[in-house]
């Protein structure tokens, strides 16, 4: 069984990491169900295990070093953070590349509900859209596993302040832009996105 948690208030980043670490230990001990946590963070940057100082253009916001995969990314209001704590071993899916591809398929299927056509890129992990001939990232992935239990996850741009990305080179990729569901001309309440995320989740996971 997968539990779903939706947090309405902005969640402190360090608190979120501690929460996930506690939860995955409980999942490992069979004392808790798997969890999908939908939330938003206050404006900040996170630096994954591959991050380098060269990817910081200007320190506009606080930077948090974290153990997830990837480089620098932005989190803030209007961005739907999706943290997944899933036991891949119990699901007989001990394949990290398969898991990442399934995350991509999930988000692509969600975006179709908004008439947005995303594409998963294995060489530039995440979901991208073609915006008038320009490739722009709409969802960033950063995951970590412990004893084949996942944590961290996806940052899907719903309606964030995209100007905050100017302080970093997102995911270490120069020459590419970022976009959001709102930026692509879609007006919808956040709860609609959450409902679609849940509906499409069970078709893949």
UniProtKB/Swiss-Prot annotation:
Q: Which Pfam families match?
A: LplA-B_cat (PF21948)
EC numbers listed for it are 2.3.1.181
For the ligand (substrate), the binding residues are: 68-75, 140-142, 153-155
Reaction(s) catalysed by this chain's protein: octanoyl-[ACP] + L-lysyl-[protein] = N(6)-octanoyl-L-lysyl-[protein] + holo-[ACP] + H(+)
The record ties this protein, via Gene3D superfamilies, to: Bira Bifunctional Protein, Domain 2
Q: Name one GO cellular component term.
A: cytoplasm
Location in the cell reads:
Cytoplasm
Q: Name one GO molecular function term.
A: lipoyl(octanoyl) transferase activity
Q: Locate the BPL/LPL catalytic domain: which residues?
A: 30-205
Q: What else is known?
A: In the reaction, the free carboxyl group of octanoic acid is attached via an amide linkage to the epsilon-amino group of a specific lysine residue of lipoyl domains of lipoate-dependent enzymes.
What protein name is recorded for this chain?
Answer: Octanoyltransferase
**Species of origin:** Wolbachia sp. subsp. Brugia malayi (strain TRS)
Gene that encodes the chain: lipB
